Amino acid sequence: MADLETGGWTHFVGIGGVGMSALARILLAQGYRVSGSDPKENQFTRSLEAAGAIIYHQHDAANLAPGVQEVVISSAVPSSNPEVVAARQRSLPVVKRGELLARLFNARRGIAVAGAHGKTTTSALVALVMKEGGLEPAAVIGGYVREFASNAYPGRGDFLVAEADESDGSFLWLKPEIALITNIEADHLEHYGSLDRIVAAFKDFIDQIRPGGKAILCAEDPRVAGLVACSPRQVITYGLNGRPDYRATGVQMAGMGGRAAIYYREQYLGQLTMAVPGRHNILNALGAIAAGHQLGIPFAVMARALGQFRGVGRRFEILWDDGTTRVVDDYAHHPTEIRATLAAASQVGAKRVVAVFQPHRYTRTHHLYREFGQAFRQADVVIVNDIYPAGEAPLPGVNSQLITGEIKGSGHQQVYYLPTLEETLAFLKKSCRPGDLVLTLGAGDVWRVGMGLAQYLEAKQILPGVGA
């Protein structure tokens, strides 16, 4: 296995993924040679290539150069992949993405952010306040952070901030100094089987905290709050209600931002002003404040960093805004996330919110279609596409019509089932009007609809403005 200090040559199979590309960027900063393959070119592969990585856009055993010392694979890569087969024939170590993250993370003072929702934004905010505070952390984030112009930050300080992935249990390989948990919900049931097992995994995650470390827990979530008594380490709580250690009061949301007064126990720390919408983002920022404050960063420094934050890619990302009509894309793919995103959309002053939802995975749809049916109350129009399988085989009787039926059953009048992205884009081109906020939702490729509509609006110049 290549040495962390002296570098080596690591090859990534599936390097274009958000998690894989972030690790590749960290290794490049540490002096590694990096190569990788991914059939699809994207912003991450282009950025890595510009930074010195060798990128192949097909899977081939020939991509495995003689000098490669280690091969990293994503969860989507099968054992039959020709590069994996070639690596095993050469007796090269083949490690999972989570294993490499754990190796990098456990070699530094680790800050891990876990939870069903909000962990990408919260981990980005933690990294930003630490950077502003002069701690120069490395950061591995599950989305594009505009302030880093990347999904990773190659800081050379003692800390590494990581978004901890609970979906397959790999977050249990991490041994954090600080573990921040945003919330716990019934998701990834294809791996865990039950909510009780998910809660048990988070208890195990807290047990992984290093001696002298801390658990920072969101008191807004009852399941997370239930972990307080289970922690063998010091517990710090944060929330908007009750008496947590860190509290945001007087929350006011307006337009594309919000503000709140921040307290640490009985001490007033100051005013927080955010330039991203949604009460959930005040809560995400509060978690980052708790982490930064525990590390000794002054509140004024953190407030400055948080006030400059413009969001993470695919988290209420504005694709078009000409002053009246907006096209926004969001990764939300769970009922709780959809409700929070629609609540944020409702505050920006649109005449009509048009939600386009692409369900993600048959298993998630099977377990949560009733909850999805109740999640769209703040949308004026709802369009549901076919399920994005994410590698899953279809389940008998599980389809998008289950969701549209539930939405209609909740009393919603304008609900449309449009199977394909192409049909959806054609529909929106005809029906989009000034004052609309069109919101694409899902973890698959529904963003293509938003991007296509933004390009159409720009090309047609229906209203003045330039697409973003």
Swiss-Prot record:
Question: What coarse category fits the chief subcellular location reported for this protein?
Answer: cytoplasm
Q: Which residues fall in a coiled-coil region?
A: none
Compartmental location: Cytoplasm
Which pathway does this chain act in?
A: Cell wall biogenesis; peptidoglycan biosynthesis
**EC code:** 6.3.2.8
Q: Which GO terms describe its molecular function?
A: ATP binding; UDP-N-acetylmuramate-L-alanine ligase activity
Q: Name one GO cellular component term.
A: cytoplasm
- An example Pfam family from this entry, by short name, is Mur_ligase
Q: Which Gene3D superfamilies match?
A: Mur ligase, C-terminal domain (3.90.190.20), Mur-like, catalytic domain (3.40.1190.10), NAD(P)-binding Rossmann-like Domain (3.40.50.720)
Amino-acid positions noted as binding ATP in the UniProt annotation, renumbered to this chain: 115-121
Name the Gene Ontology biological process terms.
cell division; cell wall organization; peptidoglycan biosynthetic process; regulation of cell shape
Reactions catalysed: UDP-N-acetyl-alpha-D-muramate + L-alanine + ATP = UDP-N-acetyl-alpha-D-muramoyl-L-alanine + ADP + phosphate + H(+)
**Could you tell me the keywords of this UniProt record?**
ATP-binding, Cell cycle, Cell division, Cell shape, Cell wall biogenesis/degradation, Cytoplasm, Ligase, Nucleotide-binding, Peptidoglycan synthesis
Family designation? Belongs to the MurCDEF family.
Alphabetical list of HAMAP family matching this protein: MurC (MF_00046)
Protein role: Cell wall formation.
Q: What is this protein called?
A: UDP-N-acetylmuramate--L-alanine ligase
The source organism is Moorella thermoacetica (strain ATCC 39073 / JCM 9320)
Its lineage opens with: Bacteria, Bacillati, Bacillota, Clostridia, Moorellales
Gene name for this UniProt entry: murC
